[in-house]
Amino acid sequence: MSAATPLIVQQAEAEQLLARIDVLQAMRQLFLDLAAGQALQPAQQLVEFPAGRGDFINYLGVLAQEQVYGVKTSPYIVREQGPLVTAWTLLMSMQTGQPLLLCDAARLTTARTAATTAVAVDALAPAEACRLALIGSGPVAHAHLQYVKGLRDWQGVRVHSPCLDERRLQSLRAIDPRAEAAGSLEEALDEADVILLCTSSARAVIDPRQLKRPALVTSISTNAPRAHEVPAESLAAMDVYCDYRHTTPGSAGEMLIAAEQHGWSPEAIRGDLAELLSAQAPRPEYRRPAFFRSIGLGLEDVALANALYRLRQAG
């Protein structure tokens, strides 16, 4: 069989199509498929460039119901003017073995990361949660606010970021008028029920053990080696959840460090999203902080690329 030419979708078109996709529902469905054995999530592949010049991570996934599999490859290229990070997703047919789609996945990555956090917030946050803290003000923070704004009756949304200026604040307020700048990190965290860490930091941003009251803290990944937004030693003092228990502990920086240096075990993870959405894991009781860690799954990339492909094919 001759090789098929895949659809090639550049960033501008990907953004246009993304606006027409229910990303939150796509993420919920993939974790339900994972729980039902209709999806497969291999571990991430980290490949380091020689001489410390960067790395690339491959995110793999299989959606049996949709008869597709795929890989997103994302390099972290060290440069004098700062690191360069890109991402492209290749979607393949399980029926023909031919490529279906090659897509610039930069914005898709941001969307699926935020939507996955939102799925976790909906599953883990107390029903009465009303105070939201957003740590970060870049595109990832904007996307997080977009997907969580309707999940609870937020009475206040406090934002803290060293880069938060009036332009960024107004941009966040365009998403949710309740967003307001906090004068300090401490002010943003004060009495918060849900804390969304949306930074590109490779080192701890907050210590959940110092919160005045138990809260749900969510954390994402960046490509930096062993990146983490909370101290590794804090895991033992929290109810820990993750996107997928079979892969996250092998990639999340604080989990790796906690296991190596602080006696923490991945067996302490109370549940992942597949287990939570299929009622196979307990919810937190909030006698202490709850922590949700996502590393970004290939399944998320494949599900979103597949939704984009189907939409593109439908015209």
UniProtKB/Swiss-Prot annotation:
Taxonomically, the superkingdom here is Bacteria
Molecular function GO labels: oxidoreductase activity, acting on the CH-NH2 group of donors, NAD or NADP as acceptor
User: Is the Ribosomal protein keyword given for this protein?
Assistant: no
Keywords, sorted A to Z: NAD, NADP, Oxidoreductase
The EC code for this enzyme is 1.4.1.25
Substrates-to-products reaction catalysed: L-arginine + NAD(+) + H2O = 5-guanidino-2-oxopentanoate + NH4(+) + NADH + H(+); L-arginine + NADP(+) + H2O = 5-guanidino-2-oxopentanoate + NH4(+) + NADPH + H(+)
InterPro entries referenced in this protein's UniProt entry, alphabetically: NAD(P)-bd_dom_sf, ODC_Mu_crystall, ODC_N
SUPFAM superfamilies membership: NAD(P)-binding Rossmann-fold domains
User: Per the record's keyword annotation, is Cytoplasm included, yes or no?
Assistant: no
Q: What does this protein do?
A: Involved in the anabolism of D-lysine and D-arginine. Under aerobic conditions, the arginine succinyltransferase (AST) and arginine transaminase (ATA) pathways are 2 major routes for L-arginine utilization as the sole source of carbon and nitrogen. The D-to-L racemization of arginine by DauA and DauB is necessary, before to be channeled into the AST and/or ATA pathways. DauB catalyzes the synthesis of L-arginine from 2-ketoarginine (2-KA) and ammonium.
- Protein name per the record: NAD(P)H-dependent anabolic L-arginine dehydrogenase DauB
